[in-house]
């Protein structure tokens, strides 16, 4: 009998939530075949069978929180239970009458045996088994509406209901009932996904544990847009990837971090860890909120290398295929609210990082060129949120001005590759 355990996923992850079982008790599974989907704080992970056999028992239901190393099921070796061998037929004609007379009680005996065996093999969720034990209910007698024939907790509750008072049933949904009583209009109570709960928790933690402050500036995007317009076809022919804005911003951020290294640091206890690498997180919209995959060693990548990496990570994020390693270890983050039409915002730090740059919508605005002349220019507000415990206002403003100057004269970025 092999145990199914929650594997170690990453240093920062100690637990997860079972999103769904992909196999049911009684199913035969091959080694390496997917068993279940586990939802963690960062990504969903599909766990596989470590050996072939029959999924014997599921100890944790979908929606249950499980710890790393916890046993959540078992797999029996081999191809499952085989039928008992048929009894050898007796050839003596004199015994045929005797066998005929014994047929009825024998059938009854086999039937009772089968019922007993069926009872012990009734497929049921752990919560259903627990409730059945507490109430003294025979699971083999409980009808279920599950298409796979699995007895669920609600099936046991429904089976028990006729013989008991309705009061216990009312206690089953205190949360939903409370929510409904809080409003005089119709509402819908939804359970937050594990990832959404984690996002909510961490955003509040950042506000409570850092001295977060935001400073703003604006960038004239004329030079970048003209450069893209002139070079986009040649760039695509040479690199088979489009030249976007993110590579310009990533290059500018790396250059600014080299000039202001405290924005590439983090606090650990009473020590300040200043990072000498440039792993830039790029916020990407996914179904359950933003995820921040990391572009590794962005200082060593060309414009094409950055665009390709961001494109691949964004595609994985949309398809929920990001690995934990692709989400960990960033030193600074860039987020682009402009893709959704945001004109200005104050991005929240991606802890333990101490800086995040917010990009916004490019909008034509009249700009004074000199005392007598105005021109409509494509302008973008940029925002830097930073941890004031480490970074002073002078450094924060200098960092943002450096990015502004580089983007308004992008030839400087091209000199860096």
UniProtKB/Swiss-Prot annotation:
- This protein is called Dihydrolipoyllysine-residue succinyltransferase component of 2-oxoglutarate dehydrogenase complex
User: What residues does the Peripheral subunit-binding (PSBD) domain cover?
Assistant: 123-160
Composition-biased stretches, type Basic and acidic residues, lie in 89-103, 152-163
Co-factor requirement: (R)-lipoate
Give the UniProt record's GO annotations in the biological process aspect. L-lysine catabolic process to acetyl-CoA via saccharopine; tricarboxylic acid cycle
Active-site residues, as the UniProt record annotates them: 388, 392
Q: Which CDD domains match?
A: lipoyl_domain (cd06849)
Sorted keywords for this record are:
Acyltransferase, Lipoyl, Transferase, Tricarboxylic acid cycle
Organism, per UniProt? Answer: Bacillus subtilis (strain 168)
